[in-house]
């Protein structure tokens, strides 16, 4: 083996986001509906013979070089890479490795498409391919969750890791003790195509740290109104799944708008004046409804719109500071290959 590559899809959170956080799902059970899209985290892993470890993330202007050893301490520089390496050595190889790891994303960090978790999945998959580790979808996702949420202590849920490994449209169930059931949905091709025709994905040019927003949400779950809103969001995931199977796009749009309102009840920091202005602009130009993807407060927003009015909405959004992002829904999760 000289080179391993992986391509890992990002995801759109359609409904139920936030109910996959352990503080909620351990007690109430969480339901999430999401779908992977044709935007990716790209990873290349190259075996070295000189006893060096190199981490290279050009899209974040980050580069680190170390002597190979069994444990790399966190120092604020690409700690997520080091934590993955530490777990691979601890759990599998029991000895240090020498390699170069290069990654980049199709979208900016803090975009709300599950980028950090998708990155972890892609890197784990690269190591699994290199070392012939017997890791299936559930094992990769669970390991990615443990690295990000437990080893690094980054607050957040589990949907992103499972979306990245399984790919496609999925209805996910989250229970206590990190138990997750992923239900792949057999959505007809024409329904997925129509959903694409009715969706506009817009990057607001506002990036944010999801962990800060999720931390704020955690503190609000003791509030009765916030908890009721979380319960409502969970039910929205069930209702949206059913509407998707029926190709009931009107109901899909209604649920999306309702979920956005509930999301703002849970935490007031998920929106701001600029996002509200963009939302109103979208509605004024033909959108039925919309919401942010992910934790909120910035990143990508997506809107449901009548396809005959889609161009007008795109034209209006292109006059703003962000950009409209083309995409399609994908059926595959993380994939790897050797060259």
Swiss-Prot record:
Superkingdom of origin organism: Bacteria
This chain is encoded by the gene named: hddA
Pathway of action: Nucleotide-sugar biosynthesis; GDP-D-glycero-alpha-D-manno-heptose biosynthesis; GDP-D-glycero-alpha-D-manno-heptose from D-glycero-alpha-D-manno-heptose 7-phosphate: step 1/3; Capsule biogenesis; capsule polysaccharide biosynthesis
List the catalysed reactions.
D-glycero-alpha-D-manno-heptose 7-phosphate + ATP = D-glycero-alpha-D-manno-heptose 1,7-bisphosphate + ADP + H(+)
Site annotation (Transition state stabilizer) points to 11
The family note in this entry says: Belongs to the GHMP kinase family.
Q: Name one Pfam family in it.
A: GHMP_kinases_N
Q: Which GO MF terms are attached to this record?
A: ATP binding; galactokinase activity; kinase activity; magnesium ion binding
Q: Which residues bind ATP?
A: 57, 110-116
The Gene Ontology biological process annotation of the record reads:
capsule polysaccharide biosynthetic process; D-glycero-D-manno-heptose 7-phosphate metabolic process; galactose metabolic process; nucleotide-sugar biosynthetic process
Name a GO CC annotation attached to this entry. Answer: cytosol
Q: Tell me which residues bind Mg(2+).
A: 116, 148
Keywords of the record, alphabetical order, are: ATP-binding, Capsule biogenesis/degradation, Carbohydrate metabolism, Kinase, Magnesium, Metal-binding, Nucleotide-binding, Transferase
Q: What is this protein called?
A: D-glycero-alpha-D-manno-heptose 7-phosphate kinase
Q: Which residues form the active site?
A: 160
Species of origin: Campylobacter jejuni subsp. jejuni serotype O:2 (strain ATCC 700819 / NCTC 11168)
Q: What is its EC number?
A: 2.7.1.168
Binding residues for substrate: 17-20
Which sequence ranges form a coiled-coil region, renumbered to this chain?
none
